[in-house]
Regions:
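Class I (Rossmann-like) S-adenosyl-L-methionine-dependent methyltransferase catalytic domain
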Residues: 2-37, 58, 62-65, 70-77, ...
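Intracellular loop-helix junctions on the cytosolic face of multi-pass helical membrane proteins
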Residues: 22, 41-49
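Short, surface-exposed "cap/lid" segments of acyl-processing enzymes
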Residues: 53-54
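Conserved S-adenosyl-L-methionine
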Residues: 119-121
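Conserved acidic residues
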Residues: 187-188
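A conserved beta-strand element that flanks and buttresses the S-adenosyl-L-methionine
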Residues: 191-194
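Helix-to-beta-strand junctions that scaffold the AdoMet/dcAdoMet cofactor pocket
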Residues: 199-200, 215-217
């Protein structure tokens, strides 16, 4: 796929011809024409790690990491899913953008002393650790909380891969609603990435309230919107049972505003699926 550099970030993009072919042919075929039984048969015959993991645990951390890593494809079906599907492409774009934004926030707060980052629903923590590595700052700690500790061992390996000291990253199994019982520091940055698209508005409000209470005045929250611009929402629902809650950047900012955040900054990845949003506690 072609690449496009925007503000120093190398993104995956589609050519105008590819956009037309996807909209006119590929997406309708996947969404409405191909029988579910035939698709599942093809996935079963394929050796694609991404597709098999998406069947077992749709939206789980393993399928995310497979998409992020973007390793060599194992067969032509895997190539189509991993290399040419807009969804994994946009996920990789989002990770790059989130890491860059986190890096910028670290640099902003590091001038005043030690920086603490709270990752909610953090999974492996790759977004946070990538941002930490990019910043090059040593006075940064990440506190990564998730209900499921399944991803933590993999995340510890990523910590070593990014060249971060193991004491700089803490993996915490628990519910973010009880965050004060899990961490004793005050974070300057809270990250809500890869979680709110699986939650209702009321559930998001609860996490935003927890985030607001954890942050000092002037602290930042980072989250994102998601749109159907990937073009295969119906396909992912009927094949993988992946039911996402789509919110525009405007809607996410409305929810953040209700929780007491403002001074919003929004950056978009070029495929139009994700926008990264930063708000500041008033």
């Amino acid at each position: 796929m072609p690449l496009k550099t925007i503000d120093g970030i190398e993104y995956e993009v589609l050519t105008p011809a590819q956009v037309v072919v996807k909209k006119a042919l590929i997406n309708p075929l996947m969404n409405y024409v191909l029988p579910k039984s035939l698709v599942l048969y093809g996935i079963n015959k394929s050796r694609s790690p991404l597709l098999k993991e998406s069947i077992l645990r749709p939206g789980g951390w393993r399928s995310m990491e497979i998409s992020y890593e973007n390793g060599p494809h194992v067969d032509w079906v895997d190539m189509l899913a991993l290399k040419f599907s807009t969804f994994p492409m946009s996920l990789r774009n989002r990770r790059k953008l989130v890491a860059r934004v986190i890096c910028g926030l670290i640099n902003h707060y590091a001038a005043a002393g030690h920086v603490n980052i709270l990752g909610i629903g953090a999974g492996t923590g790759t977004n946070v650790m990538s941002g930490m590595a990019q910043s090059g700052k040593k006075n940064v700690s990440a506190h990564l909380i998730d209900l499921d500790s399944d991803a933590f061992e993999y995340g510890q390996g990523l910590c070593r891969k990014y060249g971060l000291h193991e004491d700089a990253v803490s993996f915490i199994e628990g519910d973010a609603v009880d965050i004060k019982s899990h961490i004793k520091v005050t974070p300057q940055i809270v990250k809500l990435v890869g979680i709110i698209e699986y939650l209702s508005d009321d559930e998001v409000r609860k996490l935003l309230a927890v985030s607001r209470d954890a942050l000092p005045r002037g602290g930042s929250i980072l989250s994102h919107s998601i749109s159907r611009a990937h073009g295969v929402d119906r396909f992912t629902r009927r094949i993988f049972n992946l039911n996402l809650t789509y919110r525009s950047d405007t809607r996410v900012m409305e929810l953040m505003g209700e929780a007491g955040f403002g001074d919003f900054r929004v950056r978009h990845e070029p495929l139009g699926v994700y926008s990264v949003i930063v708000g500041v506690k008033k």
